[in-house]
């Protein structure tokens, strides 16, 4: 319920927040902002309306396009700051301090590296490494040490994951809790991301 005398004030407040839409680019910017959620000082990207929450993989895949491509580097940094808390909580076996779901998916740390790579394209490698080098090194050390519960580096250099009992890739449809497409083994996109993560982290550290 709301007091009728407050309705006009609330309406004016919402109108003031409304973005002007005068061309197609502004429409895209407006659409990008619709996925932006802020709670308790943390910044999230919602995976979709009305029922999805902030999911780690979706957040990382979408982050560059929803921020960097429209000139909002600071918003990217805010999103990444929130994500980094979830990633570090997971890697250190702590209860998550932020509301990001599916942080346990095997490709999430690899997408994080790719996401930071997109940021580096708009700033210098030195600046990117100063801001995210520690996080990148923590992620790579975590994976190489075999600490991830479902992302293992085998002797052939490829990463292996098991998806027989639980959907672990973007093909995540299930029936009775079981994956319809139980993708397991040397999953192609996981290994593409893994190769990219190795090459990029070494390149960035070398700069």
Could you say what each language-model-derived stretch is?
Residues 1-207:
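Acidic, mature catalytic/reactive cores of soluble proteins
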């Amino acid at each position: 319920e709301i007091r009728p005398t407050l309705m006009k004030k609330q309406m004016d407040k919402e109108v003031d927040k409304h973005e002007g839409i005068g061309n197609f680019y502004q429409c895209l910017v407006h659409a990008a902002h619709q996925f932006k959620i802020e709670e308790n000082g943390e910044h999230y990207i919602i995976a979709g309306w009305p029922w999805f929450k902030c999911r780690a993989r979706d957040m990382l895949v979408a982050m560059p396009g929803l921020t960097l491509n429209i000139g909002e580097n600071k918003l990217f940094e805010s999103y990444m700051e929130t994500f980094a808390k979830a990633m570090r909580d997971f890697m250190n076996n702590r209860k998550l301090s932020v509301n990001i779901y599916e942080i346990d998916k095997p490709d999430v740390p690899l997408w994080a590296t790719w996401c930071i790579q997109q940021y580096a394209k708009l700033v210098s490698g030195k600046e990117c490494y100063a801001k995210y080098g520690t996080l990148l090194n923590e992620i790579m050390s975590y994976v190489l040490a075999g600490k991830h519960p479902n992302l293992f580096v085998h002797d052939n250099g490829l990463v292996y994951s098991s998806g027989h009992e639980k959907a672990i890739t973007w093909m995540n449809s299930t029936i009775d809790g079981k994956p319809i497409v139980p993708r397991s083994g040397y999953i192609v996109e996981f290994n593409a991301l893994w190769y990219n993560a190795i090459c990029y982290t070494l390149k960035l550290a070398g700069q």
